[in-house]
Amino acid sequence: MRKKLLFFILFVLMITGIAVGIHDYFHWQVMLTTETFTESTEKIWNPNRGFYHIYGFLISDEPADMSEQLDRQMQKDTDHALAMAQINLREYRDKEISKEGLQNIERLFQAMSVTKEHWIVRFLYDWNGENEKYEPESIDFVIKHMQQVGGILTEYSDSVFTLQGLFVGNWGELNGTKYADQQTFL
């Protein structure tokens, strides 16, 4: 019995030694490279994330220099990779967006496309939390407005980071709107 126990212990030690040897032979060696870093106050451009400024544009039939409006609003913003354009369509709450209105929207997107920012775009009818005053009486106008601006969004999609909201509700955020029921979305 004693010989069997001794033989078993030697066998276990031998198997353990072989396993350790195989492990050491095949184990991947981690190669470390030493790097030296120095502190820097240099600004790092970090696209598509972080804080952003919000810029508002009221669209109407009056010809507008959207590039000048955008430049004027953005003159102090030099350090953000994102920006939000709130495009107010309240002038069209009871009608389709006119040819002139669509031209102003197109001019705005042209101006936005030459900035370094990527744009969060929100179409809305209300800036003051009073959507019942400015929202279209019929969801059909909202849908038509979405269709009308769709081509512009597609054309300038390289500068659009995301489209935010669904046009309706206080501040275009879908809250407090009569169109938030399930029937409207069907």
Task: Pin down the residues of each PLM region.
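N-terminal Sec-pathway targeting helices
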Residues: 1-15
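Hydrophobic alpha-helical membrane-insertion segments, chiefly the h-region
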Residues: 13-24
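Boundary/entry segment of secreted carbohydrate-active catalytic domains
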Residues: 26-81, 86
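Hydrophobic faces of well-ordered beta-strands that scaffold small-molecule active sites
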Residues: 51-55, 83-85, 119-122, 161, ...
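Aromatic-lined substrate-binding rim segments of carbohydrate-active enzymes
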Residues: 68-126, 140-141
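The substrate-binding groove and active-site-proximal loops of carbohydrate-active enzymes
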Residues: 89-100, 129-140, 169-180
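An active-site-proximal structural segment forming one wall of the substrate-binding cleft
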Residues: 101-118, 135-162, 184-185
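Active-site groove signature of glycoside hydrolases
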Residues: 120-130, 149-180
